[in-house]
Amino acid sequence: MFMGEFQHNIDSKGRLIVPARFREGLGDRFIVTKGLDNCLFVYPQHEWAEVEQKLKSLPFTRADARAFVRFFFSGATECEVDKQGRILLPNNLREYAKLDKETVVVGVSTRVEIWSKEEWDRYNAQAEASFEQLAENIVDLL
């Protein structure tokens, strides 16, 4: 399980340090793709396989399903951790998530998310302001 929040900088070559706490669960090779809320989703290979199976079961006759699957898979790339614990994030993913220098790497149960610090701070402030309401809304889902 992934949890916690870590701040790291992207270097001039587009490399990001993967927090040591997450490296063991992610393995040496894992998938990074466009996520929701302008962040990147990072999946270990076994979790990616499960997500892939679920998305493959969506009806391709529905335009919204096709659009989501296209968006999700077209942004996906396999990353490999180098000896310094870094990954190279492709330019298209850095642009999508507005990653420039300061980032926040967040553990979210079965995946990791990579956020620009500015976007994370904005998102987190909104979530904190409505946390009680969010809890009330999802209690029925549990």
From Swiss-Prot:
Keywords: Cytoplasm, DNA-binding, Repeat, Transcription, Transcription regulation. The keyword Repeat applies. SUPFAM superfamilies: AbrB/MazE/MraZ-like. It comes from the Bacteria. The keyword Transcription regulation applies. PROSITE patterns: SPOVT_ABRB. GO terms for molecular function: DNA-binding transcription factor activity; transcription cis-regulatory region binding. Forms oligomers. This is Transcriptional regulator MraZ. It comes from Desulforamulus reducens (strain ATCC BAA-1160 / DSM 100696 / MI-1).
